[in-house]
Amino acid sequence: MKVVVTGIGIWSCLGTNINEVTQSLKTGKSGIGIDISRLDYGYHSPLTGIVERPQLKGLIDRRMRAGMSEQAEYAYMASREALAMAGLSSPDGIIFGNDTSAKAMVEAHEVMKTHCDSEFMGAGNIFQSMTSTVTMNLSNIFQVKGINLTVSSACASGSHAIGIAATLIRQGLQDVILCGGAQEVNMYAMSSFDALGVFSHQIEDPHKASCPFDRDRQGLVPSGGAAALVLESYAHATKRGATILAEVAGYGFSSNGGGKLSTPSCEGSLLVMQRALDDAHITADQIDYVNAHATGTPQGDLVEAQALNQLFCGHKAWISSTKSMTGHECWMAGASEAVYSIIMMQGGFIAPNINLKNPDEESAKMRIATSTLEVPVDIVLSNSFGFGGTNSALVLRR
C-alpha cells in the first residue's frame, strides 16, 4: 500500500513556518548563534540553534498549557501547520520522536531541594517531564483515538517515527498518522553532550561553526524545535481530494551490532541505506539527492562518507547536510530533514552544504552541493544515525 505525505509543518532555527524555512534553505541561511548563559552554567561551548519560543496563549487553554513541555509547544505549532496544510483537524494516530525532557526534571529537583515538599510542585510537571510529553499532550489536543506512541531512539528518533507510521499505514492499521520529532533547546538538555567534547568551539562567527564534511570541522552545534508530517494511505488521500506532496517510498533500520555507544559504524550505515532502497524497490543510481546525517564531528562524517561512497560506487547523487545551517536538531532531526527534503522536492532545488571549504579525503569523492542548485529532485535518501547504534533511513519520492 502506498503511503503519502499530505501536510508538513516546521518550527526551527531556520524559521517558524514552511515559507520562512523555504527561504532559509534556498539562501543558505544559518540559524546558529550564541547563548552566553551556557558559559555561566558551565558549558565549554555556547553555540546553539536560536529557536523562537511559541506564544500559545489564545491558541490553547491555560490548563492544557500547564502540562506542555518546551518541545511539546514546538511540536504543537509544527503539527498545527501540517494538519492545516493537509486539510484535517485530527489524525487517526500520532507518533513522535523525543528522547529527553530535561528542563522539567531539573525544575522538579530544584523545587524539592528548596522546599523539601512535593506539594510545591505544579500539577503539570509530571506531564512535562515524561519522555512521552509530546504525544500525550498532542493526542489530547487533537483528540486522537488511534495509535499514541513516542519513539525514543536518540538522533534517529524522528526518522524512525516516520518509518513506523508509514509501516502501520501500509499494513492497513491506520489511515492517517501525524508523525514527526521534537527537541528541547534549553541549556539543561545538552550539558551532557557538551561534557563529551563533541561541540564546535568556532564562536568567532557562529554562522560558520557547523561544517559537515569539511576537513577542519570541530564538532556539532546543538539545536532543536519540531517538525511534523501528515502521512496517509494513498487511497484515503485521493478519496478526499488531498494534495499529495511526496511518497514515503522506503524505510530502512539497522543497529551497529556492538562497539562503543557513541562510535558510528560504516557497516551499520551502509546496511540501513541499502534496506531503505530495497524497501522502495530502487537502486542507488536512481537517487537524486541525499540529505546526509553529517553533524560536523570528525569521526561521524568520515564514517558516513565512507558508507555513501560504497553505496553509490561512483554514481554521483547530489549530497548536502542541512545541519550546516541548522546545527544538529537531535531527536527531531530525522523528521525535520524529511520536511526540508520535501520542501526541496516541491521547490525544485537542493539546499547547500554551507561552510564546506576543504573537503577531506572521503568527502572529496562525493558530489556535495556547496551552493543552492536549481535542479529537479524526484527521489531523496535521508539518513539519521543515533547514539547506541540506532540507524534509520527514509526514501522519499516526489
Segments from the language model and where they lie:
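Conserved small-residue
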Residues: 7, 25, 79, 94, ...
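Conserved beta-ketoacyl condensing-enzyme motif
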Residues: 5, 20, 26-153, 182-190, ...
